Amino acid sequence: MSNLKLSNNNNGNQKESSSFFQKVMKSPSTQNLLNSFSSNNSNNNLSNSGSNEVKDTTTNSPSQLPPNYTPPPPPHQIRNSSSIEGGEFSLLNNENSDNNNNNNNNNNNNNNNNNNNNNNNNNNNEQLARTESSVSIISSSSSGSNSGQPNLQRHSSNISTDDSNTTTETYSMSPNQTLNSNIDSSEQQHQDLSSSVNNNNNNNNNNNNNNNNNNNNNNNNNNNNNTHESRKLTRKIAQFISSPKLLQSSISQLPSTPTQQNVEIQTTNGGSSETSPNGLISPRPSNDQPLKEKKKKKFLKTPEIFKHHHHHKESSLSSSTTTPSTTSSLTSSPSSSSLAISSPNTTAATTTNKKSHKKTKSTFDINTEISVPYNVIHKMHVDFDLKWTGHNDFILDEKLGDGAYGSVYKGTHKDLGFTLAIKVIEMKESESVSLQNEINILKNCKSPNIVSYFGSLQTESHIWILLDFCALGSIRDIIESTEKTLNEAQISFVVKNTLKGLIYLHSQNIIHRDVKAANVLLSEGCDVKIADFGVSEKLNGALDQSKEMIGTPLWMAPEVILKKNYDYKADIWSLGITIIEMADGLPPHIDLPPMRAMKMVPNWPPPTFAEPKKWSPLLNDFLARCLVKDPEKRASPIDLLCHPFLKKDRGPDVLSDLVNQLFKIKKKKIDDLKKQQKHQTSQSSSSSSPQSPNATVNGGDIGSDGLSTSIISPIPSSPSDELDNCNNSLKLATSSKGMLSFKGNYTTCRDFQEEEEDSKHLNNNQDEQDDEQDDEDDDDENEDDEDVDPFSTTIFHGKKKGSGNGNGGVTSDQDDEEEDEEEDDEEEEEEEEDDDEINEDEEISATGTMVVRKKKNKSTKKSNKKKNKKNNLSTIGKSGSGNNLLHVAPNKPLPITPPFSISMTNEFKQLETKLFTYIDSSNQKIVNDIKNEIKQLESSIINKININLQQQLSPILLALEEIKQNQHTTSQPKQMQSKLSATNLNEKKLSSSPPSSNSPLTNSVNSSLTTTTTTTTSPVLSRQSSFRSSGSISSSNSSFRPNSAIMSAVNNSSTTTTTNSNSSSSNGGGSGVDISPTMTGRASPSIMKRFTTSSSSSPLSSSSDGFAFNSNSNSSSSDLKRHVITPEELNNSNLVKNKVKMFEDDNSSGSGSNSPSLSTNSSSTNSNNSVTNIKK
């Protein structure tokens, strides 16, 4: 501890004296003064009377001081007796302190001993206020000084007082401990601390005493300097002092004191100066400046927000006033020191000033341009980690919802009145890491699209996180309360701002992992902000990835569900699902159980809108870019921000319709709440007892946002608060259905779970006899366990200590230990039975977080659930009776059921129908594909078979053609023979009719006949050859039939003829032809000769046969029958005659010079023969 000695001389004119800061303004520059002091080893002068106030020395000449006067050095040690008066420490000076000082200085200067002894006798009964560092202020105006400026000095010696009114005592210090007096009080405090390090040059006291006289002589010479330059200097000093580095260093070097003390400094001129909470001295103007005081009263008016009744009592005891114009009081922080200095003229006033309790409003000199907080009462403190003090200053108005790890409330500050969103989280060892992670993320995020973090409050059992209060709630709340979805313009505005927030988070290597409409909030100005960082993760770098399976099931990306490495692009998938939620009102696959739908997301195609045609192609394309299964192909947030869908600049006016509807709905609900409150208060006033003062009712008080509810009560922050709240039977009021309600774990969902458990228990009792049915029931139970709230955030892991058991209650330590032991035994048994099968059992904690654990035995489940039910009933009973020691979280209403929610059986039927339709459609496609493939195979096979057959049949066809050609070649000579035979027959007939003669005439006639017959037969042969050629061609193409089919029709009419031609040529003898036809069965008529001459070239016709068939290329067996002459036709003589005529006509036309008589004779003879043969 260092001491202070102040010396003051009251002899002199008050006109020549000036205040401390008026003399500071006369200095040319601070740097010159420091250089002059360091070069001349000058020292500051201390002046003090027996009072506790600083006064200006008024000595006019150095003759008042002894010529060889040197002050004694301060003693090394002194013990001070302290007494507590009025809440502050006032230190009394020891009577023997100055005697010790004088005895130590007798060896140096005997002349000064007498003066010191006289002064010590006068100062036996005076008081001295001590600070942690001693300050000396000299405002001497005497002439003859070298520096001409007042000095401020601090040292670590004891403090002695001097009460003489006639003489002036000055104590000099070492030059390294001096500071320039033109630095104001705040700069003095900082630089005095730095000078306290150098305390080794105490041997220069005599030189400094000699220089002090010269310093006093120059004071009056510099009083008339230019004030304009001094004002410039003070401005520079103010800028130097106001730097934050200077204040931090000065505060860090100050020693701490356990008390809160006041500082009062007075001058003889009526002006006063005060100290700041850190001991820095600031000036006060004198009574000569009343106008300046009036101008600055409004600026220095004490704000009412810092008033508190506890601090008010303490400050009333410690504050003291002498006169309103000369004194001031300051209540500083607990670390600030105090200094009370008064003059002998005001000692009587200091003893009686405790009676008057009037706080004087402080002002400051306009020339200094320094503003320091005055009359400040410490209400709460925020350190560099943003940890607050003052838990009871906040009031929780209503519960806004449940986050990933805690419940969110609306809170207001009692004194300041500002509103915040307070997230109340129960302190658990298992969740400490996640809590610290969330706080670190919020602390480092500073973006207009991210919820701001204002600090945290911590108790033994809970921690409060102070966040932005978004009055309009989340997008999910707006959709539920208004029962309307967003249009394209509104979706683009929300998505664009959400993307900006995600881009900022990803630039900080943060993955949100829970992007959904319930976590996108709207402030009063429709600013979009991302909230709830309970499951977020900060990666180590841009290339780092995460593997943890966490998030809300229906919003999770496929790579997160498959537990693959994923990065910030998982948030883009969640943003796409959020777009569907804003457009359709609900996320996709909401009709299915959330866990089952989550498992099917990687297998199903990416989801789309319920009605894609309802939305523009740009929005559909934007959604398709977000919902790409492959994260590498998925678009980045920067690419999506440049998408044409988001190019239009849309402001918050787009949401005006929804906001207006929201406020109308909330006004109606608030009016209903008021009516209910009035009705309840009227009933409770007649029956219930008066409430405790801690509980407040805000039934008619609607906050600035118009969203506050009726009854409020703070969460107990300490054991004392819990005792205060013991008599409170009030609970936190909750918002009504759809009003500012976050989707999460709703406590009323426990009833639904209990009903399921009861039904399962009954089923198990009925099926105990059949083991197979028990296994089926177990499978059904596992499926039913997956039916959880699809809007709750899910964390998948093996174990989590301290988590809830599905009912929001907290189990005791013994229960936790028992559960851990049972879980260990169960795990060992399961591993022995089947290591691959892991049955998951979902549980929901009080904060809305769904925890996935390994399956427990049924007995342990039932016992834990029964315990939880008992705990819930006990807590409800206590809260109703008014003896609730712990705060009970309010119940949330049931979530709005979706319009198409149906029973489980209908869901299974729908699944079956969907599966069947899907299978049918897929089967139809497969069948059509198979048919097409079969047709192609058939065509290809047929083509191959045709090619092979053609290749194999080609030699057969060639052989047939060769056979036909051979037949043709063989048939030609036979036909020639037959024709020759026919001609011979004709010749014989002709020759038979006249007598044969050997005359040359007859020979010539015969020769002529032969020539004519040859000539006539030649064209016939040519025709027959052409017919044969055409017949061969047609036979190759037509189907070949066997000869038996044709010959069977002619078996009865077949004939055989034998011709014996005996030609003899002798001397002038003629040739004769003998025809002896031999008939088998039936005689061939002579009409058949016609057919022999015009027979076709078919291989069936031959000259040897008795019949000649007219068979063309397209003839058939019916044609053959048609041309065969039947006996009935032969019987008809007329028909025979006509045919004979036709035959004769043909022969006459065919043979040019043949005589008709011959032909008729021959034909008649032939016909007669045939008729006779037929008759036979």
Curated annotation (Swiss-Prot):
ATP binds at L400, G401, D402, G403, A404, Y405, G406, S407, V408, K423. Residues 92-133, 812-873 form a coiled coil. Residues 852-870 have a biased composition (Basic residues). Residues 1-231, 254-361, 670-723, 753-885, 968-1083, 1112-1176 are annotated as: Disordered. Residues 394-646 form the Protein kinase domain. The active site is at D514 (proton acceptor). Residues 1-19, 32-52, 93-125, 133-148, 156-172, 198-226, 316-353, 682-693, 710-720, 991-1044, 1051-1066, 1148-1176 have a biased composition (Low complexity). This is Serine/threonine-protein kinase pakF. Transmembrane segments: none annotated. GO terms for molecular function: ATP binding; metal ion binding; protein serine kinase activity; protein serine/threonine kinase activity. Gene3D superfamilies: Transferase(Phosphotransferase) domain 1. Pfam families: Pkinase. PANTHER family: SERINE_THREONINE-PROTEIN KINASE PAKE-RELATED, STERILE20-LIKE KINASE, ISOFORM B-RELATED. It comes from Dictyostelium discoideum.
